Amino acid sequence: EIVTGLVGSEMCIRDRAISRNRYWGSCIPVWINVDDPEDMLCIGSVEELENLSGKKITDLHRHYLDDLDIEINGKTYKRTSEVLDCWFESGAMPYGQQHYPFENEDNFFDGFPADFIAEGLDQTRGWFYTLTVLAVALFDSVAFKNCITTGMILAEDGRKMSKSLKNYPDPEELLNSYGGDSLRAYLINSPVVRGEPLKFSEEGVQLVTRNIILPLWNSYSFFSTYANADDISFKDLEKASPVQDRTMMDRWIISSMQSLVKTVNEKMENYYLYEVIPPLMNFVDELTNWYVRSNRKRFWKEKDENDIDKINAFKTLHEVLLEFSKCMAPVLPFI
């Protein structure tokens, strides 16, 4: 919808001016014959400008270049007074950051086109557009292979967030109350990651904390509390049975964890970030409300060197918590 709608209509509009009548900005490198406005010189490098002007160039801003004339065969050329539109410069970002084509040619093509870019929906007429126009003009190529476009975050009442209206929660208080992971998971699971508007709700962040963060923390706390109480060490966990020899519940939760890893990888690789949280929540429910609750007696019973079942339970929970942390690190990096 974004490609055929917003971007598609943008590609059909009339040509844009790339010049601005401002003082600050990148000078347009065009010198015009004072007697013939159709006779122009487009300068391609500092070195070329130095050769044509016969002067050492130490500054590329207007206050220096506007007074720099070029004399060729009795003709005088003065720089056009405009500067480049900032959006033109934004679109030139891939080339500017590598100082291409003057150097780093190998490094440039190693990262061009970019694997992905991410910006708000408004950039369909800004950065996305100018990146595409310049890449096509220069290389007949796209500038990026994948794009994540976010929608606008509105206040809960549907209006624009406004300091004067005070219609949104304080971000610092939000982070202090619920943590960064809750906020990240809430936003990733919202319409905003699909390029649609989001009416921000603090209650939504609370629900993520209640349904994901706290249950996970409780599972970790359960593991660490009873492992420390029974002096369960990593050396003890190494004695655990192979997965195929553990209980059906152990094998089930490990299988569920592996399914989650597979699903998350597929969604992430295809940039379907908004489809990551539902399977995550389902797994957290399976882990906390089914596996841990159904196996509490295995963790609580007395430690016995001849009883491998207790070690298997701790080993399974440890494996699952560790793999979950690694799998969900892009979404929940702080937990």
Where are the regions that the model predicts?
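Ser/Thr-centric signal marking residues that sit
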Residues: 4, 86, 316
